[in-house]
Amino acid sequence: MLLKEYRICMPLTVDEYKIGQLYMISKHSHEQSDRGEGVEVVQNEPFEDPHHGNGQFTEKRVYLNSKLPSWARAVVPKIFYVTEKAWNYYPYTITEYTCSFLPKFSIHIETKYEDNKGSNDSIFDSEAKDLEREVCFIDIACDEIPERYYKESEDPKHFKSEKTGRGQLREGWRDNHQPIMCSYKLVTVKFEVWGLQTRVEQFVHKVVRDILLIGHRQAFAWVDEWYDMTMDEVREFERATQEATNKKIGVFPPAISISSIALLPSSVRSAPSSAPSTPLSTDAPEFLSIPKDRPRKKSAPETLTLPDPEKKATLNLPGVYTSEKPCRPKSE
């Protein structure tokens, strides 16, 4: 298990980002999807939790075979997807990623949003605080992103919002910018497979970090597109975009219903687990194991002995070996 806490500051308020994150997730998913690969929305419905209150439950399938490194593609099926389940009780959210093909793989993300510059060292509960983890600050203006994802129009150093006047962020902007908020994300990655655990967990964290950086940059760079939206308007945008995304990747499900009014009973949707636990395995998985030596099953003798032709008359065998008719029991 590899645990890291990411802190991503934004030149927004927590109330503003409630709309911004929904808009960004929908648009980003649509842009990153293509025929056969991308994000398929399976469910998006209201959810009620006895502890956290009213929220929104979403389930998605993330098809990403071509985005895997070559060493990973060698051991996964051609049609490969990760299941994402998210419970949004904004400003608190839980997201879990699992894969039926890799039962020992899971990602658990616990997120909290606050109006500060990432200075709260005790934002997560005492149990999480006691776990050894690395705290990583992500700077949307100054941290480098993979070159293939770079767009000058989405670069906070160059972009300036016409509606809010915010933008063109410079190094050190977090120290004096107002307003400012922070996304605190506690990310647990598990891949408890002998021989691959460290490599896979480190790779997944690198991917998670890149996605967080790109997504938060886009949420700010698109602020003029969503800033005046109401919750009903962003939900309608979400519904239309998700249907278009499903068609884009070749999935044609029934129309997606998104509502923030009617609430489903808590028994309808399973609540999120804590970081999904998987038993520690010290043995290599079956598909990586060296075949075991097993004794051969003998369906026939290794040598075949034919009867001596000179003795066949005395063997009392069927006509294949003798011209005599086979013996039959005497009738009483």
Swiss-Prot record:
Question: Which stretches does the entry tag as region Disordered?
Answer: 272-332
Q: Where is the composition biased (Low complexity)?
A: 272-281
Question: What is catalyzed by this enzyme?
Answer: a 1,2-diacyl-sn-glycero-3-phospho-(1D-myo-inositol)(in) = a 1,2-diacyl-sn-glycero-3-phospho-(1D-myo-inositol)(out); a 1,2-diacyl-sn-glycero-3-phosphate(in) = a 1,2-diacyl-sn-glycero-3-phosphate(out)
Biological process annotations from GO: phosphatidylinositol metabolic process; signal transduction
Taxonomically, the superkingdom here is Eukaryota
Q: Which UniProt keywords apply?
A: Cytoplasm, Lipid transport, Lipid-binding, Nucleus, Phosphoprotein, Transport
Show the coiled coil region(s). none
Q: Which Gene3D superfamilies match?
A: 3.30.530.20
According to the UniProt entry, which residues carry Phosphoserine? S119, S122, S270, S274
State whether keyword Phosphoprotein applies: yes
Give an example GO cellular component term for this record.
nucleus
Q: Which residues carry this modification: Phosphothreonine?
A: T278
Q: Listed GO molecular functions?
A: lipid binding; phosphatidic acid transfer activity; phosphatidylinositol binding; phosphatidylinositol transfer activity
Q: Which family does it belong to?
A: Belongs to the PtdIns transfer protein family. PI transfer class IIB subfamily.
Protein name, please?
A: Cytoplasmic phosphatidylinositol transfer protein 1
Q: Which species is the source of this protein?
A: Mus musculus (Mouse)
